[in-house]
A protein has these predicted regions:
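Short alpha-helical segments enriched in small residues
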Residues: 1-143
Length: 143
């Protein structure tokens, strides 16, 4: 199962993960936490169904929510980034979408979901410490 592979990789790399969920309402966190060993890698989770909660708890910008909407790639990225920073985790995962049965539109139909992944790692070199942050669904494949 995917969640078992996620926990396995996190344990191998000694990374921590946190989640920020909207339409999944904690399902993602629950799936991860059902895997033995998850308590070593899972920091905390946020269920931020309202826009106000996304702004207050995760730092999603009001402008992003107005311009792109709560269900958007941009919001998913900001949710993942905010969750990782709040929890001081290396990885933030987020979900936002339209669960239904109502609320869908032609542009954003019921069932549309965006998954955000933000990887925040701190590297040390002879020049000092610096951070590298990537927010993109594709970065998860490299972990």
């Amino acid at each position: 199962m995917l969640e078992e592979e996620i926990v396995k990789k996190l344990l191998e790399k000694q990374y921590t993960v946190t989640t920020a969920e909207s339409c999944t309402g904690g399902l993602l966190a629950g799936r991860i936490l059902n895997v033995p060993g998850a308590s070593s890698v899972y920091n905390e989770g946020h269920i931020t169904y309202s826009n106000e909660a996304k702004e207050r708890l995760l730092g999603v910008s009001h402008e992003t929510l107005v311009r792109y909407g709560a269900v958007s790639r941009q919001t998913a990225e900001e949710m993942a980034r905010g969750a990782a920073k709040t929890a001081k985790a290396e990885i933030g995962l987020s979900t936002t979408g339209i669960a239904g049965p109502g609320g869908g539109t032609k542009e954003k139909p019921v069932g549309l979901i965006y998954v955000g992944c933000c990887i925040c790692l701190l590297y040390t070199s002879k020049y000092g410490r610096w951070g590298c942050e990537k927010c993109d669904p594709g970065v998860a494949r490299g972990v």
